[in-house]
């Protein structure tokens, strides 16, 4: 039995916890509180290539799934900027700002009494946009004050204090004006503009000018010349946003910011936008159309946005995509430029560097002292288990510390398999079980369960292929791996949600045997462990390099069968309701989804679960909850102990303020208990009523496969 002293074991736990950190949780020394970001940052690419790209004076989208290190890169960037003389930064957690924005009901009531006011629903949305922008400006102001007071600027602080004070007074003035009735009058006049714009553009110009004269700033101008034209509905919404934005006089604000910061020698303001993809789709568009795109275009190269986003959850709006950098952090985008073996080697090396950096700092030993067996194979299996995702890797190390190290057992291949299995069951598998309780329409919940049907078909096929025979398979010693499959790249969007939730990962792009470009996906390592699917690819033979694109791994027919069964393509015109086959979808898309039957309706594509329709219909509507509240219950259920809001926030990748607010709502519903501990900190604890309602074992919680699971007698890797 291996033994390690208590200090070394504690250091391993700290190393694991440092990788588990979410969002803006500081990477710091536990006792001294000193920042460790410079010492422990490990760039995914050699020579700090990712950091250097993000540090360019250009707008950048940093794109990756949860846990890929977007916020860590932002922290490292800010640390770097604090040592420069010509740039500064402002971090804005968009999701938290959005959640905290409120519509003033008294102001809404006053607006609805005006004859020229917009409809109440539209007013509520616009006022929400206004509050959202106000909060963003306040965040930037707060960060700039910290920068002015920083030690780097001590020598110049006295010379600029007066200017900075004036700047902040100006910001406060702008915020105050947003709540005055002249702001409301501008909205009222704009209503007439929208109604007449389609009929005669010259009349529209006159009315826009009228709106400008009401503003408190005589120099403020509102012009229709910059309006984009996509559709009448979209044009209307964007014009509202422009009136709102220009009522804040953002262009003037940026000019004043620039003037003050130029006195400090600052040439660029980097605004770091985190959790962008956590916003609802409508809010995401508003943020870009009303805030990011105008600031990016108006600021004369002064403001540079760094935007953290999820793959497939992006919206560029008027931002010129050819003029921004896009940095991807998931494994294929990072390392997939060569052949698959080189990609794996690069990802394994990043995993090794990441773990070694943390273990050497917190334990002062090499990671191999915790391993048993072939060290090279252990690193390979750790990569397979986490797909080079730092946060997932942290959870795996935490589980390994808990299940093996503190019990005197070293980490081997079986231990990694068990940790991955546990991670899948605790962190990933619950997506479908909780999905049926999501406070959304039946169609939305059915769409989630349709993906469960797709995943079941994929996993079932992978299990069936274990008994497949071919010339290539006969050359493989032992059980051949079936964890990967390929589909034409045009089918990728069907798997995007499953990938975003870590059921699978895009592994590579290759040309299949017929020369067609295909996307290769890898099933989650823990999922493969649970369902006895051997993971990886064989090595040793030249022809094994094309193993992933063998014809029996082509799942195109499976996808087409799923679409035929679950996808509805229907015209939304109540008088038409024409239904179309999947084969006609490409042609319909070329005409902007215009219905070819009635020539007026829009064709809608919906994925519905027929297999689980009865189960979804049977859910008591009183049990439906927002996603964040379901996440709180899931976390409390898994941890099996009372937790502080900050700890829950760490698991759910959100702010502790949001957890506190939603925790109170759950307590009001009798689902959790909110009681202070001895130190006066309020703790949340799941109640038996919630356990019974949401977590009672049901036959369909796990994947419903036709055949029973086989005995897991082998590790899941080749």
Stretch-by-stretch model annotation:
Residues 123-166, 170, 376-417, 485-527:
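P-loop NTPase catalytic cores that bind/hydrolyze ATP
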Residues 1-114, 716:
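Walker A/P-loop-proximal flanking segment of P-loop NTPase domains
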Residues 71-266, 311, 322, 601-602, ...:
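P-loop NTPase nucleotide-binding core
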Residues 1-21, 26-29, 149-154, 491-496, ...:
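Extended, charged/polar low-complexity intrinsically disordered regions
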Residues 68-69, 98, 276-282, 314, ...:
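Short acidic, S/G/P-rich loop/turn micro-motifs used as interaction or catalytic elements
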Residues 95, 392, 402, 411-656, ...:
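C-terminal leucine-rich, beta-strand-based interaction scaffolds used for sensing/assembly
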Residues 237-375, 379, 416, 420, ...:
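The catalytic "switch" region of P-loop NTPases
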Residues 96-99, 311-315, 390, 400:
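Conserved nucleotide-binding/hydrolysis micro-motifs of P-loop NTPases
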């Amino acid at each position: 039995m291996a033994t390690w002293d208590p200090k070394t074991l504690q250091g391993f736990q700290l190393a694991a916890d440092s990788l588990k950190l979410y969002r803006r949780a500081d990477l710091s020394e536990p006792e001294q509180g000193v920042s460790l970001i410079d010492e422990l940052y490990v760039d995914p690419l050699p020579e700090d290539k990712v950091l250097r790209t993000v540090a360019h004076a250009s707008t950048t989208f940093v794109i990756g799934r949860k846990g890929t290190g977007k916020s860590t890169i932002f922290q490292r960037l800010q640390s770097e900027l604090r040592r420069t003389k010509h740039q500064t930064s402002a971090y804005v957690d968009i999701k938290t700002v959005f959640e905290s924005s409120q519509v003033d009901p008294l102001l809404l009531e006053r607006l609805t009494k005006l004859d020229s006011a917009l409809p109440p629903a539209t007013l509520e949305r616009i006022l929400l946009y206004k509050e959202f922008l106000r909060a963003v400006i306040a965040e930037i102001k707060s960060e700039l004050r910290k920068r002015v007071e920083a030690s780097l600027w001590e020598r110049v602080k006295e010379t600029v204090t007066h200017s900075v004070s004036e700047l902040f007074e100006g910001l406060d003035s702008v915020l105050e004006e947003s709540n005055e009735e002249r702001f409301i009058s501008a909205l009222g006049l704009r209503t007439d503009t929208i109604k007449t714009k389609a009929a005669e553009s010259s009349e529209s110009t006159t009315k826009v000018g009228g709106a400008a004269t009401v503003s408190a700033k005589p120099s403020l101008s509102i012009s229709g010349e910059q309006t984009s034209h996509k559709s009448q509905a979209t044009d209307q919404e964007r014009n509202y946003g422009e009136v709102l934005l220009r009522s804040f006089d953002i262009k003037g604000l940026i000019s004043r910011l620039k003037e003050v910061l130029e006195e400090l020698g600052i040439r660029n303001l980097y605004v770091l936008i985190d959790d962008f993809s956590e916003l609802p789709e409508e809010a995401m568009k508003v943020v870009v159309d009303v805030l990011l795109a105008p600031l990016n275009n108006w600021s004369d190269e002064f403001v540079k946005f760094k935007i953290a986003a999820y793959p497939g959850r992006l919206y560029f709006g008027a931002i010129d995509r050819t003029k921004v950098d896009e940095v991807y952090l998931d494994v294929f985008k990072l390392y997939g430029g060569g052949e698959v073996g080189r990609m794996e080697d690069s990802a394994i090396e990043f995993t090794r560097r990441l773990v070694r950096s943390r273990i050497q700092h917190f334990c002062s030993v090499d990671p191999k002292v915790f391993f048993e067996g072939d060290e090279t194979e252990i690193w390979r299996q750790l990569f397979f288990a986490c797909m080079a995702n730092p946060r997932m890797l942290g959870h795996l190390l935490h589980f390994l510390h808990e299940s093996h190290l503190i019990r005197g057992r070293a980490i081997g291949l079986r231990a990694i398999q068990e940790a991955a299995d546990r991670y899948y069951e605790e962190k990933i598998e619950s997506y479908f079980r909780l999905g049926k309780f999501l406070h959304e329409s039946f169609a939305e919940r059915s769409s989630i369960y349709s993906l469960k049907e797709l995943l079941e078909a994929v996993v079932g096929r992978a299990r069936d292929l274990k008994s497949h025979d071919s010339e290539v398979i006969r050359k493989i010693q032992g059980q051949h791996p079936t964890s990967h499959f390929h589909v034409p790249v045009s089918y990728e969007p069907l798997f995007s949600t499953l990938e975003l939730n870590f059921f699978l990962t895009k592994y590579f792009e290759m040309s299949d045997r017929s020369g067609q470009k295909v996307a290769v996906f890898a099933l989650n390592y823990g999922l493969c462990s649970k369902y006895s699917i051997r993971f990886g690819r064989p090595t040793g033979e030249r022809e094994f390099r094309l193993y992933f694109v063998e014809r029996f791994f082509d799942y195109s027919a499976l996808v087409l069968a799923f679409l035929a069964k679950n996808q509805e393509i229907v015209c939304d015109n109540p008088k038409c309701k024409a239904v179309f086959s999947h084969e006609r979808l490409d042609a319909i898309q070329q005409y902007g989804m215009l219905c070819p039957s009635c020539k007026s309706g829009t064709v809608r594509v919906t994925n519905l679960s027929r297999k689980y329709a009865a189960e979804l219909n049977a859910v008591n509507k009183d049990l439906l909850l927002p996603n964040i509240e379901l996440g709180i219950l899931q976390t409390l259920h898994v941890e099996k102990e009372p937790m502080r809001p900050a700890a829950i926030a760490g698991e759910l990748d959100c702010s502790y303020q949001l957890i506190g607010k939603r925790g109170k709502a759950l307590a009001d519903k009798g689902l959790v208990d909110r009681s202070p501990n001895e130190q006066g900190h309020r703790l949340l604890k799941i109640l038996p009523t919630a356990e019974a309602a949401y977590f009672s074992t049901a036959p369909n919680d796990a994947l419903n496969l036709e055949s029973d699971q086989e005995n897991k007698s082998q590790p899941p890797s080749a």
